[in-house]
């Protein structure tokens, strides 16, 4: 089983980012970041402030309760009006009802998973929206490539991450087509650069940047959908063959070794990697191990849990003046 003690070390990283967002206007961005941190099993080591925790879960319960009473149209319209990062302003106002349903469901699933993972009670009427029929409909929509067709050039990475994960759920015996996934992420990243001038990200053309950003959301979405589907189905066999989280993490490690380390100077990338480490990868792997009694046998990859290789990579990264220290901490420890 995976050792979660590294979450204690991660507390200083989380504190650093909380300090970074301390003076942001409004509370939504703070809440967004706290929500992301809450997705990991180690949240007790990170969100030790009882007021922050209380605020987080009160906010989540309130949002979930409100959205369970809304139609898919209402949820979509609210989402379009809440554009604090500026990346939805170009999304078409008129879209297929299936698209509205898809994004509404992913929103509900994310909120529900936050509560489930904290042992919180969820509203009794949750089954009106998150049920087997709707989950299967989401999978069908994603597998039809409707999202990429109807929102081409205007969707955002959360949607693509959900699309990739749902394709894995539907076709979990098919090897991952990394070239296709990379192509999707490259297109989305170009959209960010062209349309989102207000977002303070470096305009890196490095493919690894696109790759890791997209994979971050894939890991989070995979973990969310896994939790939601298992909760609804109460079945340990539904995702027996889905072990792609291992491939995601291993590919990230492999890719970074031959990349331009200068991109790790980007604080946003450091946050993406922190998100993988805290919110998605470790948790999804742990759940797969626990529910399926599977050993993912990371030792066979000689990448992440091989002490000798890990230390060598650590020294290599530390020797490079452009490497972001937060990256080293969250990806190696």
Located regions from the model:
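Preference for long, amphipathic alpha-helical scaffolds in soluble/luminal domains
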Residues: 1-333
């Amino acid at each position: 089983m995976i050792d979660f003690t590294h979450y204690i070390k991660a507390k200083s990283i989380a504190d650093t980012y909380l300090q970074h967002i301390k003076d942001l206007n409004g509370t939504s961005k703070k809440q967004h970041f706290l929500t992301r941190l809450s997705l990991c099993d180690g949240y007790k080591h990170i969100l030790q402030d009882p007021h922050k925790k209380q605020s987080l879960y009160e906010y989540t319960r309130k949002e979930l309760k409100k959205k369970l009473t809304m139609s898919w149209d209402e949820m979509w319209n609210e989402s379009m009006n809440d554009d604090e990062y500026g990346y939805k302003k170009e999304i078409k106002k008129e879209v297929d009802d299936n698209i509205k349903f898809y994004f509404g469901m992913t929103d509900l699933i994310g909120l529900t998973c936050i509560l489930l993972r904290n042992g919180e009670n969820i509203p009794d009427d949750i089954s009106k929206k998150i049920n087997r029929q709707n989950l299967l409909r989401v999978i069908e929509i994603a597998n039809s490539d409707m999202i990429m067709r109807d929102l081409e050039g205007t969707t955002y990475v959360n949607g693509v991450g959900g699309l990739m994960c749902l394709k894995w759920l539907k076709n979990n015996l098919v090897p991952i087509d990394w070239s296709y996934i990379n192509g999707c992420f490259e297109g989305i990243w170009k959209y960010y650069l062209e349309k989102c001038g207000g977002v303070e990200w470096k305009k890196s053309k490095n493919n690894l940047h696109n790759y890791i950003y997209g994979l971050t959301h894939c890991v989070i979405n995979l973990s969310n959908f896994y939790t939601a589907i298992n909760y609804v189905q109460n079945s340990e066999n539904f995702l027996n063959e889905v072990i792609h989280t291992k491939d995601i993490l291993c590919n990230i490690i492999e890719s970074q070794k031959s990349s331009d380390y200068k991109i790790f100077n980007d604080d946003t990338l450091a946050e993406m990697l922190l998100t993988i480490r805290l919110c998605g990868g470790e948790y999804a792997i742990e759940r797969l191990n626990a529910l399926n009694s599977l050993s993912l046998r990371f030792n066979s990859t000689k990448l992440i849990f091989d002490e000798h290789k890990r230390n060598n990579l650590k020294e290599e990264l530390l020797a490079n003046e452009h490497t972001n220290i937060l990256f080293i901490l969250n990806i190696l420890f």
